């Protein structure tokens, strides 16, 4: 699939983060939102009106839409594998919001199905370049913590401000 500019995308999964990404798409000028889908008819219509795109009646309609070259997937994490696999099999490139999946196994399946389909899979891990993450990576690489076998982190922030 040849990609032209602007790249025509469909947004799937409507929530506050889909609006944040859609606003960024509009500012970029490199992408154009042409369709959207979420299970809620009301949310679809509101999003379509706000961003000037078509409200698709089903996810399958998005995937068979020849104008749609890629999807922005902000669906719940537990359906990332199913929604991404369907998009890849339809030849659509994918921007997938983090985390890739709820399990390593599903994450591997997602990357494999995109690889097999020959589509681009882009992940929305926006924090990896922040200074405190680079600092902790240097500490890990320097062996400060010994042999690292597991790590867990929680980032909390006040979204109401």
Each model region followed by its residue ranges:
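A broad helix-preferring feature
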Residues: 13-21, 63-71, 117-119
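N-terminal Rossmann-like dinucleotide-binding module
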Residues: 1-51
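Beta-loop-alpha module in the N-terminal Rossmann-like domain of NAD(P)-dependent dehydrogenases
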Residues: 53-113
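Short, Asp-centered acidic motifs that coordinate Mg2+ and/or phosphate
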Residues: 35, 69-70, 150
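Short, conserved SAM-binding/catalytic segment
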Residues: 46-53, 113-117
């Amino acid at each position: 699939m040849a990609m032209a500019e602007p790249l025509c995308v469909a947004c799937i999964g409507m929530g506050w983060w889909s609006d944040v990404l859609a606003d960024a798409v509009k500012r970029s000028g490199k992408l154009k939102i042409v369709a959207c889908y979420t299970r809620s008819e009301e949310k679809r219509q509101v999003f379509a009106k706000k961003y000037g795109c078509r409200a698709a009646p089903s996810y399958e309609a998005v995937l068979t839409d020849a104008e749609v070259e890629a999807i922005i997937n902000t669906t719940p994490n537990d359906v990332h594998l199913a929604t991404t696999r369907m998009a890849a099999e339809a030849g659509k490139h994918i921007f997938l919001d983090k985390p890739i999946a709820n399990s390593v196994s599903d994450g591997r399946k997602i990357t494999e199905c995109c690889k097999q389909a020959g589509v681009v899979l882009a992940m929305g891990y926006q924090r990896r370049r922040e200074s405190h993450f680079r600092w902790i990576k240097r500490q890990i690489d320097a062996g400060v913590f010994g042999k690292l076998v597991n790590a867990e982190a929680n980032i909390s922030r006040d979204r109401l401000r």
